[in-house]
Amino acid sequence: MALSTFKREHIKKNLRNDEYDLVIIGGGITGAGIALDASERGMKVALVEMQDFAQGTSSRSTKLVHGGLRYLKQFQIGVVAETGKERAIVYENGPHVTTPEWMLLPMHKGGTFGKFSTSIGLGMYDRLAGVKKSERKKMLSKKETLAKEPLVKKEGLKGGGYYVEYRTDDARLTIEVMKRAAEKGAEIINYTKSEHFTYDKNQQVNGVKVIDKLTNENYTIKAKKVVNAAGPWVDDVRSGDYARNNKKLRLTKGVHVVIDQSKFPLGQAVYFDTEKDGRMIFAIPREGKAYVGTTDTFYDNIKSSPLTTQEDRDYLIDAINYMFPSVNVTDEDIESTWAGIRPLIYEEGKDPSEISRKDEIWEGKSGLLTIAGGKLTGYRHMAQDIVDLVSKRLKKDYGLTFSPCNTKGLAISGGDVGGSKNFDAFVEQKVDVAKGFGIDEDVARRLASKYGSNVDELFNIAQTSQYHDSKLPLEIYVELVYSIQQEMVYKPNDFLVRRSGKMYFNIKDVLDYKDAVIDIMADMLDYSPAQIEAYTEEVEQAIKEAQHGNNQPAVKE
């Protein structure tokens, strides 16, 4: 129970009393990766997140561990090579949260991709990214392309490219990395905001003053080194330090829409260019839905709640109807949406899609280290780079020595399944185990596929007598209880949006079972009447935002 909600007070006591080699500000995928790398090397690590884990950018992506095909168009050869290699590592270390997905790249007359350039480009991509033989590109005829996805626009179709991306659950990837870090000894807590830095007599950062957002308690965490990994908030965190460079972020917003497959019966993931501006977007089938995105526009508004506007929805609807003309999707067909912010490093005069997705490490005179930019796929390598630097500084300043990076072959929580090649056999073995507990085969398969080697804990929860009084289907009940016991879920939205993903991919379950979820959480976590009221309102607001978005301007007035 290393990341249990029931251990919050114990974790807070340790954070107050101990000194840490490294304190990390930010509980997205970047912070989680740093916590795992540093704790695996033997550092004493603490991490604070002001919201829930992955509540910012790390739950709002296209949910792909990209191989970096788009960077080939910009001739960023090194980025393609590194991204491809990292993608393979992410998959191998957690096949329960990342899975290969064949992607269709239709080629139309006058479109971005011609047959020759696509074949050359995908071939280069295979070589640079070290793609394994079974997943290397295929070039398809018009007939073969339509056989893969009959909904694709036939007019002007010349054929298609066929290559592999890796689909992931970004929020679950983050929490599984975080759980492994906690197992390695990292003290990790959410809903805890860094307010100020503390300094020693040489004006070097030696701690962080924080506030528990659930109880309004203030305390100080002592640290030898502090890393700012706050994603879109890195500039806000740095503003509390006296020593800053002239670097800054440029935020852009990306939006996705979700449509039921009864309306948009997409059977194949497709990567295609839009009619309006030639931007490449994805349409991906998942759990009986099709999701489509993303947009790319500058953003300067409330970072904690970027929303989908009507303009965003219209852009994606037009894109769907252009590439899949027979489906005739309308705004009413959109079940759910999400919007996320990309924390890109400012480059003057560049359009959103032109700004590099590279990451950088900034070191202030105060000793504060900031990691900015970057991509979901590169989280492990980003962590390695900055923890290497932390290790050097700790050796120089304190004479401490730590082992080198060891995360390349380190399974994340739930990833102890015997490697990606054994994963399907592992799932079937767990389905057989579940039969002995009387758990439905489909439910068992979904749970084993989602939770990997942690699934036995969910099967055990299914045997408890409390389930029968819960008014929840077994699958939702065991996921909810597990997320409280093992994944530091405190608020209903932590579960409904991020741990389960239901707010995006099964909003009907949210509407049907939200009250029962709140009842169980209120009982297990001893909510006050005021908390029940506040958290119920938060759920209703999240539903409203997912279903309708609003006309929030990109730039606040």
Curated annotation (Swiss-Prot):
Essential cofactor(s): FAD
EC id: 1.1.5.3
The keyword Flavoprotein is annotated on this UniProt entry: yes
Designated name of the protein: Aerobic glycerol-3-phosphate dehydrogenase
Sorted UniProt keywords: Cytoplasm, FAD, Flavoprotein, Glycerol metabolism, Oxidoreductase
Subcellular localization: Cytoplasm
InterPro entries: DAO_C (IPR031656), DAO_C_sf (IPR038299), FAD-dep_OxRdtase (IPR006076), FAD/NAD-bd_sf (IPR036188), G3P_DH_FAD-dep (IPR000447)
Record-linked Gene3D superfamilies: Alpha-glycerophosphate oxidase, cap domain (1.10.8.870), D-Amino Acid Oxidase, subunit A, domain 2 (3.30.9.10), FAD/NAD(P)-binding domain (3.50.50.60)
GO biological process, one term: glycerol-3-phosphate catabolic process
Top-level taxonomy: Bacteria, Bacillati, Bacillota, Bacilli, Bacillales
Pathway, per record: Polyol metabolism; glycerol degradation via glycerol kinase pathway; glycerone phosphate from sn-glycerol 3-phosphate (aerobic route): step 1/1
